[in-house]
Amino acid sequence: MGAAIDPEPAVTHPPHPPPPARRDPVVEVQAGHRIVDPYRWLEAPADDPDVAAFIAEQNAASRAVLAALPGRDALRERLAARTDHPRRGAPWRRGDWWFQVRNDGLQDQDVLWCAPAEGGAPSAAGALPADACFRVLLDPNTWSAEGTAALSGLAVSEDGERVAFARSDAGSDWLVWDVVDTASRRVHDEPVRWARFSGAAWLPDGSGYLYGGYPPPPPGQAHAALARGQQLRLHRLGTDPATDPVVHARADRPEWGFAPNVSHDGRFIVLEVWHGTHPTNRIHVAPRRDGQIGAFRPLLDAGDARYTVLGVLDDDLLLVTDLDAPLGRVVAVDLTDLDAPTPPVLREVVSEQPDRLERVTLVGGSGRDDAAWLVCRRLHHATARLAVHEARGGAYLHDLDLPGAVTVPSVTGGRHARSVHLTVEGFASPVSVLGHDLEQALTSLVTPPAFAAEEVVVEQVRVHHDGVAVPLFLVHRAEVVPDARVPTVLWGYGGFDVAVTPAYRPAWDVWVDAGGLLAVAGLRGGGEYGRAWHDDGRLARKEHVFDDALACAAWLTGQRRDEVHAEVLRGAADPEAVWTAPRHLGVEGRSNGGLLVGACLTRAPEALGCAVPEVGVLDLTRFHRFTIGWAWSSDYGDPDDPDDLEVLLRYSPYHRLEPGRSYPPTLITTGDTDDRVVPMHSLKFAAALQHAQDGPAPVLLRVDTSAGHGAGKPVAKLLDERADVLAFEAHHLGLTLRSDQSPRR
């Protein structure tokens, strides 16, 4: 049975629409361009009286509409059923302890568990302690009554006896680090505040850890102040965090940040020096002798490539890089003479392959005579593939068999291990955990998925237009066939070298099981095909991302067939199929994907049946003035540069709106404590779109309270948000719930 379709969805307006937002134009010349900003006042913090009143009025109107949408409560029930199943991360061992992150289903936050190894063989894949041996080590669900405090960072000492953990509140990027003793579960109560955009790295003796901290922001500006001037600091246990010494900082380069790595033998501190979200970085190294950290030397400092630290093996630093290899390779750098006057020689260990090398895990090699492996995760048309190589010479050993179109979110091992654990998930299957013995090349199932939706079909095509081919996953029930009216959600991101890969999301499952089509696009600007693919969708080429999305929309709706065609990559998809029509097609995306939605909405409103930009970057002239927004200039350009601003104004959704034009039904979402993409983007865009709208379709703004960019949001808030979005899309795209929809429990 296919989807039940309402051929002409009724337009639902707020019974009491909010009053039009006050227009108070600010006119200024920025980088040679005259810009009029009528809603500048909405950039004030969410607790500003005028902004708070605007949010309250908007929420009252949107909640009245969303709560009354047909099937909204049933959708929430089905979302809860899809969410209410046990989930486990990949376990890992340090010293005499095993660790694993778990969730029993509807817990607001994931919980860290631990168990003593009790002499279990670390080389045997899946040789975990009995489940009854595990106990809770950290439960963030006990940290706040509202469930908004999250466990947002973990670092286990080399001997496993201590865990540094980071707490975040209300979805903020700000972290508070502390330490818990594994055996006693005693929390040290030494809160390290004003840290963000950095993990922690333990000293080898467990006496302290390195982290990235910032100067405290001005009072009242914690969610808005610019994030510049990160310092690498050292916290020694038992000391006052306020006195933590600065180990390394660059006052002359306040945009730099430092990701610390301590070699397993303690001889080196290796820094990945990042510059915002720029696709290149630097590597700086300091020797460590007699417990003292020496001066940092620039090892790879040209800023012309990306380097990811894998670890120190013998005397070599192993790195993944795209230097002279746009799809990635593994190289080694000799660290025996850091003061050598000549540039370091990069010795190739694993060469570039036809598929993008996305991530590598170094396992084993704790001693010079110990075997060591590289577990390489590549992307083949946005689907994960795993291969094992010998770490010292790079020789290929074997592949790991993976079940179809999947993602491998994590691979865990250790420098004393001979096996790895990995998590696997797909569009129709939640996370499972596998173990893999690297010596025997044997894979075992440790934790099966909670269920597998066998009635769901996953196909993939490449949509060709303008000489480029864009991968597009098509996810639907087996009985749903192209008939030019299937309610369809097109989801995309297209930025910052982030690959969009198969993932299990309860909301996607509910949509597909109801008879809708989910179309997930791997747009330029993302990380699906390496550096060139990213470069072709950023800066002056950023509009290629929106071209790709609208080409996918055209193929799905049978438009522009003289310009757009498809080839099949996976499954039995028909490249000539017409799946839907514009009024049954919605577009959805988050963060940079929210920009994608806003750009498609303002470019081609007639191509869409609805639009859902979530926590989106929507004012491209002022993003750099708040928190970490300046860092996004790597993809967007600098709004204070005349040439860059000219490009930005061509697609900035807030500035592309045309009063008197008819726009499709739109639901805009944000969180009032979002300090990644501050809420001003969504507030200003909603006010401007409501003012510009000349058609009958509603424009709703939904602002979550005590909620940030998305991470750490409690389950109840997530279920409410997803139910509202699904109900909005179902209503406006013409999808009604099937009475026989499977419970998945």
What are the residue ranges of the model-derived segments?
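Beta-propeller blade signature
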Residues: 114-117, 178-182, 226-238, 283-288, ...
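Blade-edge beta-strand/turn elements of extracellular beta-propeller
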Residues: 134-140, 182-194, 239-251, 289-301, ...
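Cap/lid segment of the alpha/beta-hydrolase catalytic domain
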Residues: 141-154, 166-172, 186-189, 446-592, ...
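Active-site-proximal cap/loop segments of hydrolase catalytic domains
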Residues: 523-745
